Design a protein with these regions (language model features):
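Short polybasic linear motifs
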Residues: 1
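Phosphodiester-processing cores and adjacent nucleic acid-binding clamps
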Residues: 4-215
Length: 215
């Protein structure tokens, strides 16, 4: 009698990379509509990850609770290419990184990071740097970000070694709370980046998470 192989169930999809109207000049999603749509799609949770700010998290929390959706509080932070104190023309370049609070301590640390982005790192955008990311990482889940993330940017520049070094640094800081992010957004470059990220994830034993950078 042939053995029947048990089908492996995929985890339920949850949006972990979403922008609202508080991602100014960028996000078109209305906070009040997000959990309603998530409920229609049978999702049990969703995150908010506006660019560099947390203005909408209270409204988002209340809207999710109203619809029975678990709210995940996060932010897509801007990471300075050097330090948060460097503010010269070359420092207009920055990277994107997704941070999600997994508990109250994580929410406190995320709030601290976002605040420091404004009070210490502001240069065109509210920027943090690796120093304070390491200092205030407790209770935070970190995703590698979109095509503007430091891992993806290194891949796009043809520097796989640099991409791996970036991933290693974040893994050392966040441990099992660091994930490499892949997306299916119709962008040609994303397909190549996804392939390289999967390879890096296997080599470095880092888990992968699928997101879709919803705006």
């Amino acid at each position: 009698v042939p053995r029947v192989q048990k089908e492996r169930k995929m985890p339920d999809f949850v949006h972990l990379h979403i922008h609202s109207e508080f991602s100014l000049l960028d996000g078109a999603n209305r906070i009040k509509d997000l959990p309603v749509r998530a409920k229609e799609l049978g999702m049990k949770a969703m995150a908010i990850t506006d660019h560099g700010v947390m203005y909408g998290v209270i409204d988002f929390y209340k809207a999710c609770k109203k619809e029975g959706i678990k709210p995940i509080i996060g932010c897509e932070v801007y990471v300075a290419s050097r330090t948060r104190f460097d503010k010269e023309p070359q420092d207009k370049k920055y990277y994107h990184l997704i941070l999600l609070a997994k508990n109250n301590k994580g929410y406190q640390n995320l709030s601290k990071l976002v605040s420091l982005g404004f009070t210490e790192g502001y240069y065109y955008k509210p920027r943090i740097d690796l120093e304070i990311l390491e200092k205030y990482h407790e209770g935070i889940i970190c995703l590698s970000g979109c095509l503007a993330g430091s891992v993806s940017q290194a891949i796009l520049n043809g520097n796989i070694e640099e991409a791996e070094n970036v991933a290693k640094w974040h893994k050392n800081v966040f441990g099992e709370d660091y994930y490499l992010e892949i997306q299916n957004n119709g962008v040609k470059e994303q397909v190549m980046v996804n392939q390289k990220i999967i390879q890096i994830a296997r080599r470095l034993d880092i888990p992968i998470v699928a997101t879709n950078d919803a705006h």
